[in-house]
Amino acid sequence: MPVENFMSTFYFITRRISEINEMVLQFFREAIFSNHNSRKLNVINSKFVTRDDLIDTIDPTIFNDPVEILNLFLSITELSEKNSQIKIVGIYPSCVRNIRTAKRNLKGFLQNDPRAREIFLKIISNPNSMRLAFKLMHKYSILSIYLPQWPNLVGQMQFDMFHTYTVDEHIYRTMKYIFDVSHNESRDNSEQLFKNIYNNLPKHSLLYISALFHDVAKGRHNGRHHAEEGSVDAMDFCRLHKLPISDCRLVSWLVLNHLEFSKTALRRDIYDPIVVQDFAELIKDEIHLNYLYCLTVADICATNDTEWNSWKQALFRELYFSTLQAIRLGPEHSIDWSQTIKDNQEEALTELCRAGIKKERVLALWKNFKDQYFIKNSGNQIFWHTNNILAYDPATNVPLVLFGQSTNKIGTELFIYTRDYTGIFCRIVSILVSKGISILEASIMNSKDNFIMDTFILVDRQGRSLSHDKIVPLQKILLMGLINTEHPLPKPVPLSKKFQQFKIKSVVQFLDIKGADETGVTHVEISTLDRPGLLALISSVFQKCRININAARIATTGERADDGFSISNHQGKALSQEEKGHLQTQMLEALHRLDEQN
């Protein structure tokens, strides 16, 4: 794309200008305010010194052998490791000039030199390189003369509403996040979990190499997914640097699957044992799980400043520990949720009895609740729901509509309890989206006596929890809309201009999850352009095709929606091939019509 080429050139030129400006200003300071020889001199080794807090060469011609460029950064790394009294904050301007000259004269890439490979491996294998050495290597484009893939990444923008940084900057920030969280005080539980897992990794260097290569193949436009291309590059790199074959395979696997953890956590029903077991079979063992968790979290946190939130933290934590349990039990054993059910029931029952509600009434009500309800909801949520349901009179035919703060701190939780009827989910969703409400997650469930027990996590247009001023009228609108079923569904707000700039091909994909059909469930993912009314449209197609929604996971990445659904046909069975084909056709046609309307 011309705009991509323009922006890449723009970033490249601005970086060079910034580099030259910094170098020239430093020379001016030398000439005006001080003398070159008056600076405090510290000898690092036989090749490098520091002038005050800037590293310099002893011999200005040393970079005639370009491998010595890497030795410069290895010296910085080793000083950081030793916590030396010699402090370095940057590179002396004449040294920068000599590096620039050596780069221009270089033929080929440094990784072709076995001496350079040995030095680079020492740098990336030492986490202390992330304190300063890698920052300076990134700043002065050293990776562009080492890795053949790197020059194409420098300044490459990702034209979406998700990625804030260029590809090279994002990769550097991913590596920096790994170091920062693992070596600093934890600010929250998610960072503490990351730190605990990181500390148990057998080789930290493999995580840094995986981070270096996870997006290295972006922008090649050759029809293959960047994860597939990158895994090949990672394997070639590891073999070239003579890593053990087991390490080569692990790094290549991590790059290939670096999106799988987030896809599973955000798009699929992670409380379904079949889903967890299928994911555990992909992961294979605890080592792969630990590496993948750390890489995924670092990748997300290095994407933009708002992507990692407490809602995603909770999902990732749940998937991590569920998968860990599945791996330890082995494929022949299903995950035992009985203790989770017991703990949540006991916690809720204690609070209900404390509130003066008789235990017999509670247990009588709970007989109508399925096990999945007690797995998916915490003790506090079960208490909140049960307390209100016991005070509710179903004979009035007025739905029970409750609002509260989400247990994950992100969003407002909406709980609806009422007698089920055809199209009720579509009606709920249509009302919400017509008021500009975004749905982060939907848990659809029926009791044994045919009452819906649907939970939604909602945010406003700015991604914030709903204010009290919005909740009160929304509650009234939901009540009226669910009671007056003859009223037509509200129309969604038009697609904003910023979304109209994006073209995303709609895809309806049925997942092949082993054992899912036997449980009467089919898993489907729908990827398309995010737009107002999308979820309402999807649910209306399900209704038209007589499909029941058992669970929904709504994942929005910038302008892209990747929604996952657990569904069954009107007989409560998994969809046949014929039913899948019919649903796919109807869904794609409906999405195409929505595109034309916008």
List each model region and its residues.
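Regulatory modules associated with amino-acid/nitrogen control
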Residues: P2-D59, L132, Y140, D278-N598
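A glycine- and charged-residue-rich anion-binding loop/surface
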Residues: E118-I119, N126, H163-T166, H170-R173, ...
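Short, glycine/acidic-rich hinge or "gate" loops at secondary-structure transitions
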Residues: I32-N35, D188-L193, P244-W253, D449
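Non-catalytic interface/linker regions that flank or bridge core catalytic/transmembrane domains
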Residues: M1-H163
